[in-house]
Every structure is written in structure tokens, then in C-alpha cells.
Design a protein with these regions (language model features):
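Short, conserved charged micro-motifs
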Residues: 427-434, 476-480
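Conserved core of the PLP fold type I
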Residues: 58-98, 120-245, 249, 255-265, ...
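Conserved glycine-rich beta-strand-loop-beta hairpin in the small C-terminal domain of fold type I
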Residues: 370, 386-397, 409-423, 432
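Intrinsic disorder/low-complexity segments
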Residues: 92-124, 203, 264-306
Length: 493
């Protein structure tokens, strides 16, 4: 028998789906990709980045630090600017909506707080526990490496970000899925999952809950602040049986990609959520049946920059929340600068592991991001991008309404880059399906929904959904791509 030279991890690690999706998009000139979540190339801030870099490199005093090694945790100035930026996002949400006091008398019960003074503690956003990473993606991997042993369990949304599922598989970790509702996580289902794991003696292997909290990839759902409170309360409730902390990892990669529209509806704190559309819109849940409210409340306007506070703003939760953000999607994906706020002992462990990986994120790119943050370039660019994506989403929505058959359901996002689409249950959309192969023959590509679901033995993996992106496609390509895909769907449904 030929000896196996690869480690167990090397054997488990397969090519990520994102790799062949990107390869297909880049290698076929006539193909219209509605798959990979590329950002809008036409909106990339070339002139702004050039001006900022010119300022960084204008003299030896400013340029030499940017071209030298830095510290593993990240440039001190950028960490301070990032901490203030994150605190500002939560303060804006708190000021608009009123703070929800979630840890009243240690009970973590969400109750409205109507004081004019937001209850947000500066130490929560301390730059001393903020780590700069090479994109927020790196923090996903580093956290799994620092926290989890082979065979441990990570709780995820159902569906979830498929690249993170690949990280779990590579490291030999198990995923257990928790259903989504139109306003975020299904807390009742989470409690049942935790109870089942406790009965089976597996709760001690649960280390983490992974939540894509804003305009979720792939569904577009936003989990509201009250649900974040309830989530943390449930995790804390089961910690005694687990015998260790159970952390919440809040992935906020899409937080600032909220849509800016004219004449925004005024609300009093409702959580934005995607609008179900189609002939039977709202009749079934995201992925699993009967979990979506059949009578969704009217969708209220999203007014920008994070109406929903992060889990960091939950009083008393600072030692249980890992928060990941990024400057890549809101500014320029090629910059690959992200950040995380972590509690101890995780912060130190992750920092040390990162040091073994790369000694620290690119100094030049960190100085670039610090310059655009401090100068206001970043904020102005994000505001333009929010309007741009709102327009492109509207173009895709109108094309879907025109070309998709009535049997297809879809959810209209209020931020992010994606539409989530569901076909009748007897029409699979996977890589080996007739829909996928016919779409490729017609030079249009989507992400099969099945790759966004964890391999959870507690339920059958849905295979009749798809994710389509308006991020990088031109308006003409969005219209033509949806037309091609609609032709395929009308033929096969």
C-alpha cells in the first residue's frame, strides 16, 4: 500500500467551490457570471487610492514605515481608527433606534431603553483587543485554529457562507445547522438543537456559533439586535452543561453595504429583512420548509450605516463575542484588510497564530486604509457604493420579475450583493443538475444553493435553490444574464 504523505488536514482539504466559480467567470469571455461575489469593478476607487498612496509615500518619514515590517496585531493608528469607526457604527444605530438593554439584572432580556444616552461602553471597542487581518476571511481560519480541536462542533445558520463550511471541513470540525427566519436566526430551533446536543453528550464539543449578521451571505437576511441578545442568552444558558464558554462569532462583512435610497421609509426600530416574492412568496422558509412567516410584516426602509447594533453592544457580552469586519468589500476587495475584536484568551492566541502565518498584514495596505479612513475618502466612497448597489439590485429585481416563471420564489435584499432564489422542490439546482448544466450551456453561472448548507445529519440538505449576485456584473449583463437564466428556468420547470 502506497504511504500517505499528506496530513489528515491535507487529505480533507478540497478545492473550495469559490475557486472554480471564479475560474469559470474569468476563463470564459462570453459567460455572464451571477455567481462569485465580486464587488463592482467600475466603482473601485482608483483615483482615491492613488491620492492616498501618494500621501503615504510623500516623504521618507511617512513612507518608510509603510514599506517596513509592522507588528503582528496591526498598525497602531489603523487599529485606533478602526475601533472608533466600529464604535461610531453602533452609536449611530443606538442613537436612531434607542438602545436595547439586554442584560438587565444579568438576565439578558431585551427591553427597550429610551434614554438619550446610548449604553455603549468604550472599553468594548478598545483597540488593545483589535487585530488587523488579511481580510476578514483570515480571522475565520485563525479563530477555528485557535479555538477548535478535530471533532469539535460549530453551530451555523442554515444556509450559511459556504467558504466557512470549507474551513470547518478542512480542520475536521462538524457543523450543526440552525434555521433562519425572515428576521434572522430561529431562536426556538437553536434551543432545540442545543438541548439535543446536551442529551447526546455532544454539547461539550460545541465551541462556537457562526453568524453572518448583516445582509447574510447567501440569503440577505439581517439578524436583529434583540435576536442577538436572545442568541447570547441561550449560549450562556448552556455553558454550564458544556463546561466551557461558547462564543458568538459575528461576521459583519456586509454591514456597510446597506442600500441608500431616496425617500426612505421611516421606522421605529424594525429590523430590515429580505422581501419574499413570487407566486407563493412567504409561504415557506429559507431552505427548510414551513419556517418562513406566511404573512411577513411590511418591509421598512434601511437608512444606512447599520441600523442594527453589533453583538458587541450587548451589555456584558464582551467576553463572549468575536466580531469580524472588513474594509475590502466596502472599499476595495484587492486591498485585503480586515479586522477583528476578540476577548482574551482568544485575542492573544489568534495574534500568535497569525504571527506564525504572516508576521502581520501588509504594512503598505494598512497605511492606505488608515489614510482613507482619516481623510474621509472611505466614508464618501461607501456612500456612493450604497447607492450604486441599491440601483443594481433594483435592475436585477426588475429583470427577475420580467423573466423568471411564477413558480420561482426569490427574496429582495436591502443590502449586500445577493438575491436568494428558490425553485420548486422537485427541480434541483446543484452542480450535477439539468438546470446548472443548461445554464452553463447558455453562458450564465449561478451558485448552487446546496453548497451553502452544512452536512447536518439532522435534516436533508435542500438542493433546489440558488444564489445570484449583482455585484460586479454591468447593468446590461444583469439584464441579459437574468434573461438567459429565466429562459432556462421556464424550459425546465
Amino acid at each position: 500500500m502506497k504511504p500517505q504523505i499528506l496530513s489528515k488536514m491535507g487529505q480533507r482539504t478540497t478545492e473550495p467551490p469559490i475557486s472554480w466559480l471564479m475560474h469559470a467567470a474569468l476563463s470564459r469571455p462570453k459567460l455572464i457570471s451571477l455567481a462569485a461575489g465580486f464587488t463592482d469593478s467600475a466603482s473601485l476607487p482608483v483615483a482615491e487610492a492613488r491620492a492616498a498612496l501618494n500621501q503615504v509615500l510623500r516623504s521618507p518619514k511617512t513612507g518608510q514605515p509603510a514599506l517596513q515590517y509592522g507588528i503582528t496585531a496591526g498598525d497602531t493608528t489603523l487599529r485606533q481608527l478602526t475601533a472608533r469607526h466600529l464604535q461610531k457604527l453602533d452609536l449611530q444605530a443606538a442613537s436612531r433606534l434607542g438602545v436595547m438593554k439586554c442584560w438587565s439584572d444579568g438576565a439578558m432580556n431585551p427591553t427597550p431603553h429610551h434614554s438619550n444616552t446610548p449604553i455603549l461602553h468604550p472599553e468594548t471597542y478598545s483597540s488593545k483587543r483589535l487585530l488587523i487581518t488579511s481580510g476578514s476571511q483570515q480571522l475565520l481560519y485563525l479563530t477555528a485554529e485557535a479555538l477548535c480541536n478535530e471533532g469539535d462542533i460549530v453551530l451555523v445558520e442554515d444556509p450559511t457562507y459556504f467558504v466557512f463550511l470549507g474551513i470547518l471541513q478542512s480542520r475536521g470540525l462538524r457543523a450543526r445547522a440552525v434555521r433562519l427566519e425572515r428576521d434572522g436566526l430561529d431562536l426556538a430551533h437553536l434551543e432545540r438543537v442545543l438541548q439535543s446536543l446536551r442529551r447526546n453528550g455532544a454539547l461539550r464539543r460545541v465551541k462556537l456559533f457562526y453568524l453572518v449578521s448583516y445582509f447574510q451571505n447567501p440569503t440577505g437576511v439581517t439578524t436583529g439586535f434583540q435576536k442577538k441578545c436572545g442568541l447570547l442568552k441561550l449560549l450562556k444558558k448552556f455553558e454550564r452543561a458544556a463546561g466551557h464558554p461558547i462564543y458568538l462569532f459575528e461576521d459583519a462583512a456586509y454591514r456597510e453595504l446597506c442600500f441608500q435610497k431616496d425617500n426612505q421609509a421611516q421606522s421605529s426600530g424594525s429590523t430590515p429583512s429580505p422581501r419574499p416574492s413570487g407566486e407563493r412568496a412567504g409561504a415557506r422558509g429559507l431552505g427548510l420548509e414551513n419556517h418562513w412567516s406566511p404573512h411577513p410584516a411590511p418591509l421598512l426602509g434601511w437608512r444606512g450605516e447599520g441600523e442594527v447594533k453589533s453583538a458587541l453592544a450587548v451589555p456584558g457580552a464582551v467576553d463572549r463575542v468575536i466580531y469580524a469586519g472588513t474594509f475590502s468589500k466596502p472599499f476595495a476587495t484587492g486591498v485585503r484588510v480586515g479586522y477583528g475584536i476578540l476577548p482574551e484568551p482568544l485575542f492573544t492566541a489568534v495574534k500568535h497564530i497569525k504571527g506564525n502565518h504572516d508576521f502581520g498584514t501588509s504594512s503598505l495596505l494598512q497605511h492606505l486604509v488608515a489614510r482613507v479612513l482619516a481623510s474621509g475618502i472611505y466614508g464618501r466612497h461607501v456612500a456612493r457604493l450604497q447607492k450604486r448597489y441599491a440601483h443594481k439590485a433594483r435592475v436585477m429585481k426588475l429583470a427577475i420579475k420580467k423573466h423568471f416563471p411564477p413558480a420561482v420564489e426569490w427574496w429582495e435584499p436591502e443590502g449586500g450583493l445577493y438575491f436568494w432564489v428558490r425553485l420548486p422542490r422537485n427541480v434541483p439546482t446543484g452542480v450535477k443538475s439539468k438546470v446548472f448544466s443548461t445554464a452553463l450551456k447558455n453562458d450564465v453561472l449561478y451558485v448552487p444553493g446546496e453548497i451553502c448548507y452544512a452536512d447536518d445529519p439532522a435534516r436533508r440538505k435542500p438542493n433546489h435553490e440558488m444564489r445570484i449576485s449583482f455585484g460586479n456584473a454591468s447593468e446590461a449583463d444583469i439584464r441579459e444574464g437574468i434573461k438567459r437564466l429565466g429562459k432556462v428556468l421556464r424550459k425546465l420547470i
